[in-house]
Amino acid sequence: MSLWLEHFLTGYFQLCGLVCGWSGSRLGRLLSSTFLVLILIELVGEIETYFTEENPDNESVPAYFAKVIMGVNMAYKMIHAWIALSALFECRRFRYLLEELPPVKATSFIYRHLILEIILFACNAFLVLSEYTIRGIYLENLRYAYSLQAVRARYLQMMVLVDRLDGKLEQLHHRVISGSSDYKTLRLDYAHLAKVTRSLSHLFGLSLLLLNVLCLGDWIIVCNVYFMVAYLQVLPATLFLFGQVMFVVCPTLIKIWSICAASHRCVSKSKHLQQQLKDLPGQTPVERSQIEGFALQIMQDPIQIDVCGIYHLNLQTLAGMFFFILEALVIFLQFVSLVRT
């Protein structure tokens, strides 16, 4: 990874409040920690205001759907606050991951997602300015846009580390197929990568679980807007509104698909490495025993990213998530048909 890209990602993640103290100097860590504390104070203030302010007793159906959308927006801020808080306490563990997974050559995968992140930032800025021009609301939309951008950047933060892990697995695979006979060193290197993968799962597991739950929240917003436009007719069916709705749900789906695909590549390379070992011809019984022991180690300790012990990140998980969303949409449409009648 080029130096400018590494510095850009470092600054971007610090600006979003996702990391603490990437800098090696004490002053850099102090400034980063102070910035995180300021973000936490602001977010906690917004959350407290949301739960303590008195809302008017408006029992109309449009008001109910508007409150649901506001609730999902607040969920983004709450998760952003939790990520910033965990960044303060998990600073050393994150630095350990960065040391164990140093920058590698930047791939097209990272550049594509960097471009996507820039596009999301531009769309966020455009929507904030549009809302200010139309309704005169600026600060509240800016706060929500900041939390939305930061929470979605959590996917990119993990994808960078998964891409580095993928590069390490690729190097190990090349050493095996090139004829390296030092199986003891190869086994130690693989065990180290498996340990790093577990650390990666522990650090990002809960975040990924919450972000995947937020994906369902994004679909709730889409369904509520659809209901308010198609049946209650309290919102105009404009192209701008359609663009806002797509901006809510599409980037999240793209990021979930990307992180699942990146994790699936690591799992596939681990299985391919095991198959390559089985196909290697053993010159002596001792060498054959070492090869079989290495293959058994890979089978017993596979490279896979665990999400809070509930599921593993791979393309099968992605398919299950999409089927769950489709079932939820079917239930919603049935509910809409009942309300309409």
Swiss-Prot record:
Keyword terms: Cell membrane, Membrane, Receptor, Transducer, Transmembrane, Transmembrane helix
TM helices/strands, residue ranges: 2-22, 31-51, 69-89, 114-134, 203-223, 234-254, 319-339
Any one GO biological process: detection of chemical stimulus involved in sensory perception of taste
Topological domain spans for side Cytoplasmic: 1, 52-68, 135-202, 255-318
GO cellular component: axon; dendrite; membrane; neuronal cell body; plasma membrane
Location within or outside the cell: Cell membrane
Signal peptide per UniProt: none
Tissues in which the UniProt entry reports expression: Expressed in neurons of the terminal external chemosensory organ of larvae.
Topology of the protein relative to the lipid bilayer: Multi-pass membrane protein
UniProt topological domain (Extracellular) ranges: 23-30, 90-113, 224-233, 340-341
Main subcellular location of this protein, as a coarse class: membrane
Keyword GTP-binding: no
Molecular functions per Gene Ontology: ligand-gated monoatomic ion channel activity; taste receptor activity
A Pfam family the protein falls into: 7tm_7
InterPro entries attached to this UniProt entry: 7TM_chemorcpt
Task of the protein: Probable gustatory receptor which mediates acceptance or avoidance behavior, depending on its substrates.
Family: Belongs to the insect chemoreceptor superfamily. Gustatory receptor (GR) family. Gr2a subfamily.
Protein name, UniProt field: Putative gustatory receptor 9a
Source organism (scientific name): Drosophila melanogaster
